Amino acid sequence: VDQEEKDNEQYQRKLFRDYVLRKNDHLEIRRELKRRFDAGAELTGPKGLRKQLAAFDLGYFGRAYLKHYFVRPSPSFHEELDEIWTKGVLKGRNPAMDAKKISRLDGSKNVVAAPRGHAKSTNFTFKDSLHAALYLYKHYIIILSDSSDQAEGFLSDIKTEMEDNQEIRLDFGNQQGKVWK
């Protein structure tokens, strides 16, 4: 095991400890995940604790799987964006257990306005679309942007993460798609 892998494992363990009990939503599940973590349960892999916590904690999902995008401390505004997705799309449900139910729920209509550079697209278009695809609660994700080039860029970034991101591959398996458009 090289130093980079050791550093990543240390990062992932600290991140899990920092996030598992940080909020009160899904509190029973959070407590059980913490108990299992303390007992030495596997953090990674298809049944790992990371995948289970990231199912309903979008802030954790971004930092655990997309740490190269979420490098600085997030402003509270990003928590508000996550809350919009959690309430509007997930309806407070846990996609690890309720993906099929979530996929059949009515959608939501929300408008978010913020200045350029506030990571609205990074959160909604990129992170949350990737989350929906990996946890299988949205089957047809539409990406709208100022231009087709910008939308294609987001799709390309999502494709790259699904196919090449080692953390995603470790927990979700091979996500290589046949057609991307």
Where would I find each of the regions flagged by the language model?
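N-terminal accessory segments
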Residues: 1-108
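Contiguous, well-ordered alpha-helical segments that form the cores/surfaces of helical PPI scaffolds
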Residues: 79-86, 122-134
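Walker A/P-loop
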Residues: 104-129
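A structural signal for short, well-ordered beta-strand segments and their strand-loop junctions
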Residues: 111, 142-145
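Catalytic micro-motifs at enzyme active sites that drive phosphoryl/nucleotidyl and oxygen chemistry
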Residues: 115, 130-132, 175-181
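Post-Walker A helix-loop "phosphate-sensing" segment adjacent to the P-loop in P-loop NTPases
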Residues: 131-140, 163
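Conserved nucleotide-state-sensing and coupling region of NTP-binding domains
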Residues: 144-181
